[in-house]
Amino acid sequence: MGPRLLFWALLCLLGTGPVEAGVTQSPTHLIKTRGQQATLRCSPISGHTSVYWYQQALGLGLQFLLWYDEGEERNRGNFPPRFSGRQFPNYSSELNVNALELEDSALYLCASSL
């Protein structure tokens, strides 16, 4: 079978409520091909120091990915090492997925807390 182009769609959901008061994610939509790398960004609610990342594949419930608090990774879900992230001094966070696979097509969400 010849090479087949697989599209990988990544959707992000913005926080509800006024933009300045909620969690914000960017980009809101992302389409990549298999093998590429994707980066998602999350800005927490002002004053929040913890950021949580979740994945929701089509037809499945939310799956926990990563938890960062005050710049440290505090917990990690059962995902391959190609899923990584970091938290910056301003408490915003980044989720990176390397060597994308078709099964990575999902809704990715971030949340924040004190």
Swiss-Prot record:
Organism: Homo sapiens (Human)
PANTHER family named in the record: T CELL RECEPTOR BETA VARIABLE 5-8, T-CELL RECEPTOR BETA CHAIN
Subcellular location(s) of the protein: Cell membrane
Signal is among the record's keywords: yes
Annotated Pfam families: V-set
Protein name: T cell receptor beta variable 5-8
GO BP annotations listed: adaptive immune response; cell surface receptor signaling pathway
Domain of life assignment: Eukaryota
Function: V region of the variable domain of T cell receptor (TR) beta chain that participates in the antigen recognition. Alpha-beta T cell receptors are antigen specific receptors which are essential to the immune response and are present on the cell surface of T lymphocytes. Recognize peptide-major histocompatibility (MH) (pMH) complexes that are displayed by antigen presenting cells (APC), a prerequisite for efficient T cell adaptive immunity against pathogens.
Subunit composition and interactions: Alpha-beta TR is a heterodimer composed of an alpha and beta chain; disulfide-linked. The alpha-beta TR is associated with the transmembrane signaling CD3 coreceptor proteins to form the TR-CD3 (TcR or TCR). The assembly of alpha-beta TR heterodimers with CD3 occurs in the endoplasmic reticulum where a single alpha-beta TR heterodimer associates with one CD3D-CD3E heterodimer, one CD3G-CD3E heterodimer and one CD247 homodimer forming a stable octameric structure. CD3D-CD3E and CD3G-CD3E heterodimers preferentially associate with TR alpha and TR beta chains, respectively.
